[in-house]
């Protein structure tokens, strides 16, 4: 290279070659976690943030509810509801749910159902719908209304078919002999003038546009049986006894099938669980095994049930259920996500099992008619 030539960009500032002063790292400031004394939210606060004050009140209501002081919790929730801004939808829904649950525990089921119906009308996503259905389930379980409890579980399972705990609850509901809905209480929280010995007319049951919990407009099966028996008791007793026995057997089959599906779901989920979640899973599987054994069904019957109830179960679906996203949709789409009736649900899940037992049932009916 000739003298005097220079390379473009080949010049450097002298500061590049200077030794930089050594930096001594300062010790990081110690982390100080905020320590809260037990029941700190009962202390007087000078906070000027209205939302912060309302949040403290909600904590007080939640603690009272946990202690089963439902009247006190209801007072806290009600005072919050009056002061909450209309734009705070999340807390408003939480508070309203708390109010409804307190009312149910206090025996004010009609008011609880009215609040549940209001939450239902404002549901805009699958999480909202799940909360509404769980709320209805709590109210109807408190009322010991077997028919409506089962329908709530059908709707929950239609929304979350891979949830094993809902299937366990459904099995329990099928085996419970609870009475029907008390007179004067309608499924949607409105007064019903229908008497206890008549079918409830369509006009007496609130089923607003797009209602998610459209409940049957007839009395539960046990009420219908009692009405029929009162007409000609002597003539109908053998027939009623047979029907009652068949209904009990069908309920046992549905309960067993529900437990088998719950066990299949738990078995698939256990590989992704640890600690207390895994312990609960394994303990529940053992309990299910004991209950299934108590049904005394034949082994080939149990295999048929297990095959029918596990047709849609694949590991990929379990992962999707565990990490599912909240779907924000309109009321019409939410309504389409749940079943319209128990018949629709049972046709989907138990039809194959029922068809397996139909020949035996038909043969039984023929034998009864010949003997008669």
Swiss-Prot record:
Residues 187-196 have a biased composition (Polar residues). Residues 183-212 are annotated as: Disordered. InterPro entries: DUF5588, TPR-like_helical_dom_sf. Pfam families: DUF5588 (PF17826). PANTHER family: ZINC FINGERS AND HOMEOBOXES PROTEIN 1, ISOFORM 2 (PTHR31919:SF1). This is Uncharacterized protein C8orf76 homolog. It comes from Mus musculus.
